[in-house]
From Swiss-Prot:
It comes from Salmonella typhimurium (strain LT2 / SGSC1412 / ATCC 700720). The chain crosses the membrane at residues 12-32. GO terms for cellular component: plasma membrane. This is Uncharacterized protein YebO. Its main location: membrane. It comes from the Bacteria. The gene is yebO. It is a single-pass membrane protein. Residues 66-87 are annotated as: Disordered. Keywords: Cell membrane, Membrane, Transmembrane, Transmembrane helix. It is found in: Cell membrane.
Length: 95
């Protein structure tokens, strides 16, 4: 047993194990770093998309406000509709 330790086989095995651990560690670091950079790119794209959607919503609000009909015409039509709604409610039996 003492001959195996002194012959250098043990140091060679130790060197091989440390090299394997180093290669596995570098591979893990590569994939974690790659995933992190892709996640950062996706976050940047999502933030840009959010900014564009906010601008589109603001533009849509302005367009809707510009195309909105005058409010004086609405109360006249709204006053006649509740009578029809009341007739329908009277026909439906309560449970």
């Amino acid at each position: 047993m003492n001959d195996v330790l002194n012959s250098g086989a043990f140091s060679l095995a130790s060197l091989i194990v440390s090299m394997v651990v180093l290669v596995v560690g570098l591979a893990l670091w590569f994939f974690v770093n790659r995933a992190s950079s892709r996640a950062n790119e996706q976050i940047e794209l999502l933030e840009a998309l959010l900014d564009q959607q906010k601008r589109q919503n603001a533009l849509l609000r302005r367009l809707c406000e510009a195309n909105e009909p005058e409010k004086e015409a609405e109360p006249a039509t709204a006053a006649s509709e509740p009578k029809e709604d009341e007739d329908i409610i009277r026909l439906v039996a309560e449970r």
